[in-house]
Every structure is written in structure tokens, then in C-alpha cells.
């Protein structure tokens, strides 16, 4: 009675009864809709089953641990718990087979529990199935929907749960992770290894059992999710329980998402339908499946050109501008849809285009936006910005004002961070002066404005270098034609910067300098590929001497002591590869556009560096 009085008083003080009534109305609306839908055909696996009355619960989202403040009569009938036994408690007690149990039953799926927790933390709706138990221990399947309820200010005040219970027949004596058949076996094994009276027995017993006493939810959500895919694979070899847990596809996806970021894992989602997350993570970590292949596509890109810029938008390659005959700046846009049965280049019809240019950059933001910056036009160098939404019904190039822009330039480098911010670095002015500045433009704001990134020191001015993103906001700069005293020389140095720092600063990447360690030869206009795991692959470009531009070099800039290593790849690589004409598609495909004969580019011929297994047929 005291608990009920305290709960009632608290809800009265914060005027929450009105919200509960709203929640009940929400539930009643659901019943009415359900009755209306009874005549509709139901498929196996659908969420609602009209023959089973739904249970409704409401929890307080403003209190820690989401305590229950309301359950309906159906809940009491199906679970065997009275309202006064459960109000003020988190509803996880339904995962316990016995009311006195201290942890949930091992057959309850920890991944579903983790997903529920994530949805509650992010304030989004959840739908799924979960094993529950009646008060007497009878197993139930709970088809559950959780929906947040917000107040006028948008604050989540309550969470309503709609539950459809059905009895299930499962073998409760079977555990999901059979680490040991009996605890006695563990005791006997420990006794054999270490006498029970020795200090080693106690040390071994505590160390061995400590982590296994954690629930699967804690292991998955709080421990495994914080590790790299490589570390998770190693942990999976420790015992059968951890092996089963690390083999769970949802756990593997959660590990990859936390290690690589939501944007990258979202891009890789289509690959997991063929390879699944475990194999994909292994192949991207070990690079065991990497290979070159060559294919041709249809269509025509006319007029012929060089010095164009290309990028990937989903599974589409986009080409803009370039240098035509007699150094004519071109302003057309072409797209190649790799999902098509017979991919072919097609011109994008637009009402107006940005001024023609070459030596510019073309980037993809927000999944479907194309962003053009700078380059050399008819009247000299440019510093304008144009955006086109490729998914729009009628794609249109629109100029972005951007406040005070950077100096006009060409042969600069650009990249995108956090999916929506354009970063521009270096390049060359009309007078031939090399630049060392770095600018950022956030195109998601109402009035995008260029912002220069102030640093106490910057790498030598350069053009033709590469910018590669790793760790979400960190950038690796490599190569280019850089100032070296009074000379301009190809560079082989690498630098990093973290734009999330309060005071970002450039740092030269200090690589291991052991005898015999390989380093990429100095180069410019090369290819730099950012892998999902944060490593960077360098190849191609303009190189002096007898070095092969097709040799691949790999580095992990996040390592404490980074070192370059050569990546030997089977297959026939392209003879030449340039950064402005190479795209990364889906995180696992590096496409090099065309070879060329003299001044003529062959854009119907593509070389692909496959970072993961391809299970479809060649194009």
C-alpha cells in the first residue's frame, strides 16, 4: 500500500494521470483498429493476432529503469501477476522463470533484449518477439510493441507496451549456451588442475567463472560491442558459450556498427545479404578475398574528355565535367547504374549546369547529393559550390552561396565527414601558388557557410594530394606535389588531423622506420581508399622512376606506431589509376574508370578492386 501511495503521489505531482489516460486511449484505438482488421487475411509472422486479446502496460520514462505505472486486466490474466505485485518494477521480471530468480532464463534472446534497450535509449519504437514466463514458470511468446509517448515539448514521458501472449512448447532443460553440462564438471576439472587448498585454485576459479557469471545481455551490449571484429573473433574461441554468442548475426552487426559507424554499416548492409556480417568482417580485416577484375559497360560519354571528376552515389557512378578538345571545360553529367542488368552510361538531363570546368572535385553527401567545388573554367579558376540531388524527380543543379568562400583553385583535394560536411584542402591558384589551407562547409544548415580550420601549423602547400577519412572525423593527408624549399616535388609524407578536437592540428604520421620497411614512393593524383575498418589503401598516380603505379600499399593510421605494408592482389590491375577517376562503391568495391590510349580515355572499360567476395556473376 505504501508503494502504491508513493507512486500515486508522484504521478499526481507531475500531472501524469492525463498522460496515462492518453495512453489508454491509444490502446483502445489499437483495439478498435484491430477489430476492424479481423476480416483482413493474416500472414504467418504478422505482429497482431486478433484471436488473442492484447495486454497493455505503461511505464514511466522520467524515472530510472522505466518502472511500470499501469497494467490492464489481460496482463494479469496471462502472466499470473497481480497489478500490485508489479507496479513500480521494470517489466524484465517476465524474463525470469521463477519470481525469486536473480537473472533471466538462458533461453531469452540477449540480442532482442539489447535491441529493446537501444530503442528505449534512442526514444524510438520497437517491435519484436521475446520469450517470457508466467508467474508459475509456464513459457510464453510475447509479441511486443513499445511506443514512446511525448508531451507538448517533445519530451518522452511514458512508454506504452502492447503485448500479445501465446503459450509455447520449448525444452526448458536445454540451455542456449551449453558451456558445461554440470557445475560439478567444472569443480572436478579445477580440482584436477589445482588442489583445492592451494591459492592457485581460488585464483583460477574466480578468474575462470567471473566473466561467465555475467548475463548474455551484459556480455553482448557492454563488452563485445566495444571491441573490434578481430578481437570478438578471438574471444569466440575461448569457450562454447562465447562462441555461440559471437556467432549471433545481430551481435556481429552491433560490433561492426560500433567499430565502423552507422553510416558505413548502413552502406555495407546489402553485402551482408550474401556474406553475413561475420564473414564480411573477417574478409575486410584479413583481406583474404581481395582481387582485381575487369569488365566493360555500355553507353557513350561524349565528347571525349580527361581531367574529369567522378564519385559514387550508392551503386551509381557519376561523372561531371572534364577537359575536352583544345582544353575546353565541359559541364555535362553522366551516370552509370551498376544495379542495372546491363549497365550503361547515360547523360543526366538538367535544365542548367554549373559552369564547365576541369581539375575540380565531385563529392557525395547525404546519400544522394552531388557537390561540385572549384576547378578551372573558361574565365580562370573557380571557387563556387553547386549541389544536385540525384534522387530528385527532376535533378537540378543549385548554387550554394556559402558566405566568404576559399580562394579560387584547381587540383585541390576534398572529402566528406559525418556524411554531410565537405572538407577542402590545398590546391593551386591562378598564379601557380600552391595552397595549404583547409576549409569546411556544412551543407545541412539553413545557410551553409564556409569555415576555415585554423591550425598552428600546416603541412607544406601542395596540389594533387589525397584526403582519406578514418575514425569518423579524422583525416589522413598523403602525397601530392608539395613545396620543398624553392622546388615543387612529389611528396611521400602522410599527415593526420582530427576535426573534432577543440583546437585541430596537423601531425606528421610517424611510421615505423625499421630496416627493410617499405614505404610508398612519392606521388600525386593517386588513389586513396578508406576502408570500413579505418585502414587506407594507396596506389596509382604519377610516380617518378621505375616504380609501378599498380603496387598497393596499406596503412592503419589509428595504430600507435603505424607502418606501411605491401598488399599483393591477384588478378590484372589497371596500368594507370588516378584519384579523380576512381570511386568506392558500397564500401567493398573500388572502381577505376577506364584506361586511355594517348589522349583518348576509354570510359567503357572498368577495373574493379574487390575487397570482399563477390557471389554474383560478372557484369
UniProtKB/Swiss-Prot annotation:
The modification S-4a-FMN cysteine is found at residue 91. Disruption phenotype: Late flowering. GO terms for cellular component: cytoplasm; nucleus. It is found in: Nucleus; Cytoplasm. Highly expressed in stomata and leaves and to a lower extent in seeds, roots, rosettes, stems and siliques. Also present in sepals and anther filaments. Pathway: Protein modification; protein ubiquitination. Changing residue 92 to D: Decreased interaction with GI. Residues 44-123 form the PAS domain. Keywords: Biological rhythms, Chromophore, Cytoplasm, Flavoprotein, Flowering, FMN, Kelch repeat, Nucleus, Photoreceptor protein, Receptor, Repeat, Sensory transduction, Ubl conjugation pathway. Interacts with ADO1 (via Kelch repeats), ADO2 (via Kelch repeats), SKP1A/ASK1, SKP1B/ASK2, ASK3, SKP1K/ASK11, ASK12, ASK13 and SKP1N/ASK14. Interacts (via Kelch repeats) with CDF1, CDF2 and CDF3. Interacts (via N-terminus) with CO and GI (via N-terminus) in a blue-light-dependent manner. 'Adagio' means slowly in Italian. This is Adagio protein 3. It comes from Arabidopsis thaliana.
